Swiss-Prot record:
Record-linked InterPro entries: Deltex_C (IPR039396), Deltex_C_sf (IPR039399), Deltex_fam (IPR039398), WWE-dom_subgr (IPR018123), WWE_dom (IPR004170), WWE_dom_sf (IPR037197), Znf_RING (IPR001841), Znf_RING/FYVE/PHD (IPR013083)
Native species: Xenopus laevis (African clawed frog)
The protein, known as: E3 ubiquitin-protein ligase DTX1
Keywords, comma-separated and alphabetical: Metal-binding, Notch signaling pathway, Repeat, Transferase, Ubl conjugation pathway, Zinc, Zinc-finger
Lineage: Eukaryota, Metazoa, Chordata, Craniata, Vertebrata
Tissue spec. comment: Specifically expressed in regions undergoing neuronal differentiation. Mainly colocalizes with Notch1.
Record-linked Gene3D superfamilies: 3.30.390.130, 3.30.720.50, Zinc/RING finger domain, C3HC4 (zinc finger)
Amino acid sequence: MSRPGVLLPVNGHNFGSQGGPPRVVVWEWLNEHGRWRPYTATVCHHIENALREDGRGRVALGQVDAQLTPYVIDLQTMHQYRQDTGTIRPVRRNFFEPSSAPGKGIVWEWENDAGSWTPYDTEICIAIQNAYEKHHPYLDLTTLGFCYLVHFHSMCQVNRQTHRKRRLRRRMDLAYPLTMGSIPKSQSWPVGSGSGLPCSCPQCLLVNSTRAASNAILASQRIKVPSGPPPALPPPPPPPIHPSGLRQSNTYSGGAAGWGRTGEGMRSTGGIRNGSGFSRSQSVPGAAPYPGQNNLNRPGEQRTSGSSSRASIPPGVPALPVKNLNGSGPVHPALAGMTGILMCAAGLPVCLTRAPKPILHPPPVSKEDIKPVSGVSGICRKTKKKHLKKSKNPEEVVRRYIQKVKSPPDEDCTICMERLVTASGYDGVLSHRGIRAELVGKLGKCNHMYHVLCPVAMYNNGNKDGSLQCPTCKAIYGEKTGTQPPGKMEFHVIPHSLPGFSDCKTIRIVYDIPSGMQGPEHPNPGKKFTARGFPRHCYLPDNDKGRKVLRLLLAAWERRLIFAIGTSSTTGESNTVVWNEIHHKTEFGSNLTGHGYPDPNYLDNVLTELHRQGVMEERSLPY
C-alpha cells in the first residue's frame, strides 16, 4: 500500500529526480501515542510548494489553515514546532500509489463522542478504500492491529469486544500532491548533519523498534476479507469492578477509531517515562490478538512476589509486568500489551510478572485532620463564567507592545517565514486596519522583530485578552489569561507524607469542573463539552517551595490557565476539559505512571512552567 517511513533526507539532499514512477505525497506528524497522523491535502500541497522553493527552509502552516497559525515545520530537522507552547513533534514525508485513496482525494472518517468526524490514519484509510472498491461487505481490521469490523452496508464500525458501533463516512476532498522520480532511502526522521545515522534518542528507538516488529507481524499476516458474513463477535466483557471512591481512568481502546473511552478495548499497561521529570502517562496501544499468537509463556511459578519472583526468571530473559495476572492457564496476548506481542512475534522469551499497582490516593483522612495551608487564606477558590469585555482591537494591542523599525535586517520573520524586507506572508490572508504589509516592528522587552501584521494574526487566533506572547522567547506582554471553564479549586493539608518528603505533611488540591456549554472564547461556541475524571486530586509537599507553588497555582486558576477545552491526548476525545501545559502530580504514594513522587525536579519544573505562562511570585495574587 505504501512505503512506510519514507522521509526527507537531511541538509537539502535531492528529493527525487525525474524519470521514476509518480507517487502521492502525504505529510504526517507523530502524536504522543506513536501514531503518524496525516495533514490535510491542502496543507500537504502547501508544504510541497515550499519544499520546491527551499528544501532547507521553514513552512508556516497558518498561511493555508487559520487553525494551524501557531505551527511551523522546519524542513531541515523535519520537526513541527508550535510557537505558542514550544511543543516539538517529528514529521515525515510518506509516499503512496496514485491509485490509492490519497491520490483520489478520498477520505474515510469515523464519528467521535462529540459528534464530529475524525479521519483514519492514512494506511487504514487505504485499506478501507481498497475493500470498498472490491465490493467486500465488510473489512476486519484485526491484522492491522485493531479489534474492529468495518461494515460497508450500514457504514459503521463495530468494536469486536464491546460491540459498540460508530458511524463512518466516505467523502471526497482535494487529492494529495503528486511527485515524480525515485523515492529517497527510508530512514527515521533526520538528525544530525549528513551523518546518515539513525537517531538514538529514546523516542526514536521506541518508534523504530515498534515499526520493525509491527512490519514483521504484518508480513506474516494477510488481510483476509471473505465474501460471506463477518465472523461472530465475542460476548461483551463483564463491567469492571472498581474500589469505592476511585474513579475509573481513561485508557486506549486499541481501535482504528482512535482513543476510545474506558471499556471499549484493551487496558493500558503503564506509562512511558521521558526522563524529563514530566513524563506524561501514556497508555500503550493494545493491539487485537492475532491468530495463533495467544500462547505466551504460562506464568507458572513466576507468580510470586519480591526476590523469589525475580530469582525464578532465567538470566537474560526480560520480565514483562502484566496487570490482570490472576488465576492459572494461558494469558491472552492483549493483557501483555504491545510490548509482549512484539516480543512474542520476534520469538524472544518473556516471563510474565505481576505488575505493581500505583498508589493514587492517601489513607482515609477525617475532617478533623484536614487543616488549612499556612500562609494561604481560605480553602477554596471558584471561577465563574467569563464576562466578556468589549473586544480589544488587535491592531491597538499589538501597537501597545511593539515599536516601529525603520530599517529592518534582511532576515526571516519567524511567524510567516518571509523576509523582513518583504511583505508579510499574511498580506491578503488577514483583513487589517491601516497596517502596511511591509511594516516591521520589534517587541519592547525582548527586541525580537516581526512584520507588524504577523503578531496581529497571532492575536486574532488567540484568547484576545489584551496580552501578547513573543513566539521566539515566550516573553509575555500584559497579563495572559486562559479559557478554562467554570469550576472549583479546593486545597488543604492532610497528615500524610509524600515519598521523598518525609519531613513534612502534604497539600492536597482538588479540582472539580462540571460539563457544560462552550462559550465564545472556546473552540466550538454553543457546543457541549465534557469533563472526564473530575474531581481530580493533586499533591504538593507542605514545605516552603510547595506552598509557593500552591500560591502560583491559585493565581493561574484565577487567570483560567490550569485547564482548557480541547482534545484529550489520552482518549482522543474532542470538546473535553484537558490539562493546559502546567503539570500536576496525581499519584500520591508511588511514581509508576510518571505523575507521582518521588520526583526531585518536579517543584522546580512546575515553577518554570508557571513562569512561561506569565505567573510569577511578584505578579501573583496576594493569597
